[in-house]
Amino acid sequence: MAPPRANSGDGNDGAVGGQSKLSPSGLLIREIPGGYGVPFLSPLRDRLDYYYFQGADEFFRSRVARHGGATVLRVNMPPGPFLAGDPRVVALLDARSFRVLLDDSMVDKADTLDGTFMPSLALFGGHRPLAFLDAADPRHAKIKRVVMSLAAARMHHVAPAFRAAFAAMFDEVDAGLVAGGPVEFNKLNMRYMLDFTCAALFGGAPPSKAMGDAAVTKAVKWLIFQLHPLASKVVKPWPLEDLLLHTFRLPPFLVRREYGEITAYFAAAAAAILDDAEKNHPGIPRDELLHNLVFVAVFNAYGGFKIFLPHIVKWLARAGPELHAKLASEVRAAAPAGGGEITISAVEKEMPLVKSVVWEALRMNPPVEFQYGRARRDMVVESHDAAYEVRKGELLFGYQPLATRDEKVFDRAGEFVPDRFVSGAGSAARPLLEHVVWSNGPETGTPSEGNKQCPGKDMVVAVGRLMVAGLFRRYDTFAADVEELPLEPVVTFTSLTRAADGDGAARRGV
């Protein structure tokens, strides 16, 4: 594809014969501002800005400001040279333009999960996982049908599996604080959520039992080999990190043994699902489905929880005791101590503030910050105040933290507002929920075989709610230090105040 003509954004409106062109909704059609600069050198500089000199938020905000507030821009996206053959994208940085990426009739999502580069298929047993298939690919519907059936069939296992993981995790947090603390949440979350994910989806022996204590290390290593071009601030100094992570692919053979052990575990754990699929869902080779289940469980589910839950705890820690007291009151009214376990149904029906907190965390910090898709045809993309022509084949990119913090959609858009989605009848919250799009679709939408919305959407939301409800059934309040990093915040508990026991005593770890 030839490079599109760059535009400064300073009044170069689309026109034919001196007449201004208007979009179907009456917006003036402009040329897309921005540009791609000098091949190789400009993408390299943009990569350094994105990862090290500015950070993602400032990278985009500075370019929006440079082009007069335009929120549809031509930019280079990392990793650039030498990992990505073509770093050029059209960035969609507001809630309205971003929605193009959620319309499967307008964008092709084949091989766009990770943006401008595609991991080696050797990391997936030679198969292309569901997440890399376009919705129009016949294999997409077949594989997603199995995954959706699995998620629905196992939903009633989520709450008991999470309770077990939560109890073990926070018993360890309590013990660490009593021993002198502080205690890092991320390390425990990383360990216990892998067992939870596999117990919830498949049952049987968890990875820590079947594979030993190194199960998490093996899973995370496999994730790193896929995502290292998108990681930053994990190796010091940064020039060394940039050379190691962003310049060349880590060779898949270095993780072949670990992936083989992971696959062997899932071949046993998911045997019943694989057997059922062979009978009831013909057309999917058993080996291909096995590697897809590995990807769904480890990349989609576990990888998502690894990022998402620290963000929830981060926002709760920053909100402080006043919000904690409200949440504790709501949770204990719906699920009093000694009155049975917290269920997904109880949270759904009786804990509106808990639900709102989780949706707000997903709005502020979606587990996957970006979406990509390739234009299926020439089209017009509309922002709030302008329209832009996009050519067939151009790669569209959406930076979700800007789209879901759009001040033209949300009041106090850059703030964490715990009760934003609380509404007695639900009517006021629903229009806002349409702009919570972490799942590759609106929160009001439903995953289907023919769309790209996350098949585990309801499970992810349920786990977030169970985390918040579990915290405030067990504790009155807590304090934690938060270190912001590009992928996930590091949350370290400094104190937890246990809810009063039956004798009225309270325990505190410091």
Curated annotation (Swiss-Prot):
Q: What catalytic reaction does the record list?
A: (13S)-hydroperoxy-(9Z,11E,15Z)-octadecatrienoate = (9Z,13S,15Z)-12,13-epoxyoctadeca-9,11,15-trienoate + H2O
Report residues binding (13S)-hydroperoxy-(9Z,11E,15Z)-octadecatrienoate.
300
| Enzyme class at the top of the EC tree | lyase
Family matches, as SUPFAM superfamilies? Cytochrome P450
Cited Gene3D superfamilies: Cytochrome P450
Tissue-specific expression: Expressed in dark-grown seedlings.
GO BP annotations listed: fatty acid biosynthetic process; oxylipin biosynthetic process
Instruction: Specify the protein name.
Output: Allene oxide synthase 4
